[in-house]
Amino acid sequence: MRNQIFRTVKEWLLDSGFNIILDDENRRILIIEKEAHGIKNMILIVSDSILIMEQFLFEVKNPTEKIYKTLLQKNRDIVHGAFVLDNTGRRVIFRDTLPTDNMAQNEVMASINSLGILVGEFTNEMIEMSK
């Protein structure tokens, strides 16, 4: 019963055409991709209470206030999830979380698809920020 949520999420991902690169049911981690939609090495951590989704996007080589301001402003446009920074403050990651108690497939797919939309709309800016 403990891993039922994990198995359900995995089934939803497969039904939606995602490639599962890593499937570690013991640690409850999945790594998925669907490169045509901007999803590559997205990590999903499935606990009893929350689903965490993260994907590294780029590293800021020359950090400026303008770059961080742009990221924060773009967060407002992201339907699900947000830009976050790692401990160094240079690695930009997309992150979203969902409570698992009443989680539905459409919520998980909406969160993941939000990243695909973000990548499509913001690619040029992300490339510039990573220079």
Segments predicted by a language model, with ranges:
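Charge-rich, low-complexity N-terminal segments
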Residues: M1-I39, D77, V84-D86
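Long, continuous compositionally biased terminal/linker segments
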Residues: K34-E59
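Hydrophobic residues embedded in beta-strands of well-ordered beta-sheets
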Residues: R27-L30, I50-L51, R90-V92
